[in-house]
């Protein structure tokens, strides 16, 4: 991925030495928050720029940015997600449900990874601070594991229904979080609409 190699998206991911370092940095990101304050990811804002290449010209399947509400997982603002958990006791058991985004190639890979707990746990680096609204995920890109921190704001319609992917278990958050982190790694959700299953599996497993 040339743009990643040249650092075009360098502010959107981190080349940490290990998962432990990523968790330390995650704690630093929320360390200054006071009281009930929640993490807000300024590098991938809750706005049209995180949805599309051009927020004023969404693709044909796209939802106008002004109609999107960014709802928090931890705030129980998402339809059906009344008792949110990152991964249920049966990881991947509920399956992956595609939304409006044309990223089936990635979701197919994600569904396969989600059916194997040892693979899923590899990319889900941290949900320890989910109550502060932050998660950390990693993907294998351009020969390295790239770490991505995201907040828990998910693009939804005004009824709280996620526009994009989610788990078939509405309380399970990992699918929404991982898709958002993957979109951030590539600059926006629209950017992950093209790809193949083999590429998606490598991104999620390193193999």
Language-model features and meaning:
Residues 1-207:
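Structured alpha-helical subdomains that flank or immediately precede key functional sites
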């Amino acid at each position: 991925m040339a743009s990643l190699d040249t650092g075009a998206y360098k502010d959107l991911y981190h080349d940490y030495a290990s998962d432990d370092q990523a968790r330390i940095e995650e704690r630093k990101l929320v360390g200054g928050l006071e009281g009930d304050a929640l993490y807000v990811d300024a590098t991938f804002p809750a706005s049209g720029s995180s949805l599309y290449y051009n927020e004023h010209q969404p693709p044909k399947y796209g939802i106008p940015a002004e109609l999107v509400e960014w709802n928090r997982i931890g705030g129980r603002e998402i339809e059906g997600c009344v008792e949110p958990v990152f991964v249920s006791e049966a990881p991947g058991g509920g399956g992956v449900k595609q939304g409006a985004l044309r990223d089936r190639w990635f979701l197919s890979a994600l569904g396969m990874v989600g059916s194997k707990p040892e693979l899923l746990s590899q990319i889900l680096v941290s949900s320890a601070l989910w109550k502060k609204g932050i998660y950390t995920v990693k993907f294998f890109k351009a020969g390295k594991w790239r770490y991505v921190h995201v907040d828990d704001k998910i693009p939804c319609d005004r009824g709280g229904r996620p526009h994009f992917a989610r788990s078939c278990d509405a309380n399970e958050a990992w699918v929404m979080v991982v898709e958002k982190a993957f979109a951030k790694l590539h600059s926006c959700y629209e950017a992950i609409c093209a790809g193949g299953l083999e590429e998606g599996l490598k991104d999620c497993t390193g193999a």
